[in-house]
């Protein structure tokens, strides 16, 4: 073996080589000595590129590539993604095979596989073909998951911001927990995103103008382009729509149960006819009817031959069948295609519950009916006659079969009819335009003409003018009638409002006096008015400050508002102060006398209550007879405590 030179020539190590060859090699070395470093770099890069090309040709796929692989159970092409073997879970390592790639299939994340590169096919190149191979919900959901994952890579490629988009975590039994989904090669994503390199907005505009999408992948790529465009503009993301997904394995059962309910309720399944000529369907129904009638006749003959006695009703029914058998068959054979269609529809209608009820009621129709008119002549009427509908088939009898509910509905219907009759007899009836000798449209045209043209009486004849005048007078008398009850109620309401206003006017006001400690001042008059306005209306003219702003008077219009302000001020001072503040409420002369009388009455009652308490304590002491027990001590403590509480609560 020889040493490899930068030019690619090989030097032999044998001692018996010719001197001429050595000289030639030395000449070559001298010619390229100056550019040896540059050539060496080119050779190294070429070797590395050859190594990469060799690996790509040998393998054909990289980690992160989307592929189609055959599922082991169904032998069907399934979407998946290649992962690094270092990320394989313990379950996947048990079935690991040398020289094969780890593929995690999309879907519910329950299956994976170690696949030979020859068993895989690229995802994008075969998407249109393989995505339409099955219509099962499980396969379609797997394809949607794969397309959604590709869309995330597309948006990440367009946004170029790692902080904005976070890579998702792989969820598969063959992959370790917490492993991030590998990135796809930029060459694949760029070929998918950009038809014309560097043009994104024009691509979106073109798709918006054509509004044509070849497959699901194209829709996802467009959606991700628009989302990336909004992200670059600093706007919100696109709205996400999640389709309603059924539980795998239960969607067919749910569909069958719904269909079963439809069949039970409305005879849905029996109404599905076979596609074909109407004549063929009619012939099959005729054949079935003939066979059923012949079988009935044969069974009746066998019963007669065996000596079984038949009732009169059965004999009549058999006789009717024998007489009408031939005629009925001939008439059915002579009927046209439309009659066959009607018969098939009748048979289908009998499948419904309402038709079965009608079948129980004997409402058969004969083809020919004899009727007598008033003169006694018999009239032969051919064709279908009108059936007399039973009242028991009306909705009020069909919906609720309870006797009580039926009586209630009948009574409500009768009462509604009575109300309608009473309403029709009242004077508020509609205007009869026919009596005026014109239709509503003509009257409307005449009224419009009279409203638009001031010279209406000159343009039209006297009859039309009279009609308009009569209609307007009727309309005014019809529309301007007042309800006497409403007119009578109006003065009462007005009187109540006036009484309330007088009460508020006659209600005496009250004055709140505020006094602060020595050496301190109160807030200004405006500040006090703003503070106490929240309790009610104030009389600003009667409100004033005195004693060098150490005292003030706030006049309230209503006594109730003043009392509320007084009580709130006693609880907590409504303005900031550093000294003690006293509040006093004074009523006017008339109100003060009433207030004083009430206070005196209250004081008298409180004194009487104290006397009763003292008498009770004295009675306990008299009953003790000079001996004090524990029970007596407890009673005296309770009574004295109650007495002291009453004394503390007394207002001086």
UniProtKB/Swiss-Prot annotation:
<feature type="domain" description="PWWP">
    <location>
        <begin position="63"/>
        <end position="126"/>
    </location>
</feature>
<dbReference type="InterPro" id="IPR000313">
    <property type="entry name" value="PWWP_dom"/>
</dbReference>
<dbReference type="GO" id="GO:0035098">
    <property type="term" value="C:ESC/E(Z) complex"/>
</dbReference>
<protein>
    <recommendedName>
        <fullName>PWWP domain-containing protein 6</fullName>
    </recommendedName>
</protein>
<feature type="compositionally biased region" description="Basic and acidic residues">
    <location>
        <begin position="329"/>
        <end position="348"/>
    </location>
</feature>
<feature type="region of interest" description="Disordered">
    <location>
        <begin position="1"/>
        <end position="24"/>
    </location>
</feature>
<feature type="short sequence motif" description="Nuclear localization signal">
    <location>
        <begin position="272"/>
        <end position="279"/>
    </location>
</feature>
<dbReference type="Pfam" id="PF00855">
    <property type="entry name" value="PWWP"/>
</dbReference>
<comment type="function">
    <text>May influence gene expression by regulating the function of the PRC2 complex and modulating H3K27me3 level.</text>
</comment>
<keyword id="KW-0805">Transcription regulation</keyword>
<dbReference type="GO" id="GO:0006355">
    <property type="term" value="P:regulation of DNA-templated transcription"/>
</dbReference>
<keyword id="KW-0804">Transcription</keyword>
<comment type="similarity">
    <text>Belongs to the PDP family.</text>
</comment>
<keyword id="KW-0539">Nucleus</keyword>
<comment type="subunit">
    <text>Binds to MSI5. Component of the PRC2 (polycomb repressive complex 2) complex which regulates histone methylation on histone H3K27.</text>
</comment>
<dbReference type="InterPro" id="IPR052657">
    <property type="entry name" value="PDP_family_Arabidopsis"/>
</dbReference>
<feature type="region of interest" description="Disordered">
    <location>
        <begin position="302"/>
        <end position="348"/>
    </location>
</feature>
């Amino acid at each position: 073996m020889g040493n490899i030179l930068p030019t690619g020539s090989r030097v032999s190590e044998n001692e018996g080589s010719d001197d001429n060859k050595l000289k030639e090699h030395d000449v070559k070395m001298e010619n390229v000595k100056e550019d040896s470093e540059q050539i060496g770099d080119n050779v190294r890069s070429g070797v590395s590129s050859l190594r990469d090309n060799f690996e790509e040709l040998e393998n054909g796929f990289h980690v992160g590539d989307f592929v189609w692989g055959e599922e082991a159970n169904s032998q069907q092409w399934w979407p998946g993604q290649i992962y690094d073997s270092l990320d394989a879970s313990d379950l996947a390592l048990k079935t690991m095979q040398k020289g094969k790639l780890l593929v995690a299939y999309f879907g519910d994340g329950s299956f994976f596989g170690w696949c030979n590169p020859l068993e895989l096919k690229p995802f994008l190149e075969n998407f249109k073909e393989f995505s339409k191979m099955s219509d099962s919900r499980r396969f379609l959901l797997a394809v949607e998951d794969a397309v959604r994952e590709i869309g995330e890579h597309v948006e990440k490629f367009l946004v170029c911001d790692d902080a904005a988009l976070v890579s998702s975590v792989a969820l598969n039994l063959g992959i370790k927990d917490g492993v991030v989904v590998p990135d796809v090669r930029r060459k694949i994503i760029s070929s998918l995103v950009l038809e014309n390199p560097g043009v994104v907005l024009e691509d979106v505009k073109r798709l918006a103008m054509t509004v044509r999408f070849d497959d699901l992948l194209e829709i996802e790529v467009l959606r991700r382009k628009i989302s990336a465009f909004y992200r670059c503009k600093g706007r919100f993301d696109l709205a996400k729509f999640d389709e309603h997904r059924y539980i795998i394995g239960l969607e067919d059962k749910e569909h069958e149960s719904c269909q079963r309910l439809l069949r039970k309720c409305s005879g849905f399944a029996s109404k599905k006819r076979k596609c074909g000529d109407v004549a063929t369907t009619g012939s099959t129904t005729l054949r079935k009817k003939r066979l059923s009638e012949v079988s009935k006749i044969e069974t009746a003959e066998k019963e007669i031959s065996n000596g079984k006695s038949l009732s009169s009703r059965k004999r009549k029914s058999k006789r009717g069948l024998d007489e009408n058998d031939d005629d009925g068959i001939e008439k059915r054979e002579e009927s046209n295609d439309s009659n066959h269609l009607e018969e098939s529809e009748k048979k289908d209608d009998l499948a419904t519950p309402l038709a079965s009820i009608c079948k129980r009621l004997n409402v058969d129709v004969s083809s020919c009916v004899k009727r007598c008119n008033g003169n006694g002549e018999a009239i032969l009427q051919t064709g279908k006659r009108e059936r007399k509908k039973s009242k028991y088939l009306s909705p009020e009898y069909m919906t609720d079969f309870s006797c009580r509910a039926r009586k209630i509905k009948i009574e409500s219907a009768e009462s509604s009819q009575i109300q309608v009759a009473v309403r029709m007899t009242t004077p508020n009836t509609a205007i009869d335009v026919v009596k005026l000798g014109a239709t509503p449209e003509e009257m409307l045209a005449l009224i419009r003409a009279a409203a638009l043209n001031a010279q209406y009486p000159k343009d039209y004849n006297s009859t039309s003018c009279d009609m308009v005048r009569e209609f307007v007078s009727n309309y005014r008398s019809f529309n301007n009638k007042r309800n006497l009850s409403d007119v009578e109620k109006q003065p009462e309401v007005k009187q109540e409002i006036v009484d309330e206003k007088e009460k508020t006017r006659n209600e005496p006001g009250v004055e709140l006096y505020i006094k602060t400690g020595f050496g301190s001042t109160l807030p200004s008059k405006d500040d006090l008015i703003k503070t106490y306005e929240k309790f009610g209306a104030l009389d600003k003219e009667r409100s004033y400050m005195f004693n060098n702003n150490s005292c003030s008077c706030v006049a309230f219009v209503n006594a109730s508002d003043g009392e509320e302000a007084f009580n709130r001020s006693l609880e907590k001072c409504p303005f900031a102060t550093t000294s003690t503040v006293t509040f006093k409420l004074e009523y006017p002369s008339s109100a003060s006398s009433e207030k004083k009388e009430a206070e005196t009455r209250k004081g008298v009652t409180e004194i009487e209550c104290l006397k009763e308490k003292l008498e009770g304590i004295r009675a306990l002491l008299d009953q003790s007879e000079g001996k004090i027990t524990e029970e007596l001590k407890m009673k005296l403590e309770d009574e004295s405590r109650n007495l002291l509480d009453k004394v503390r609560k007394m207002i001086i």
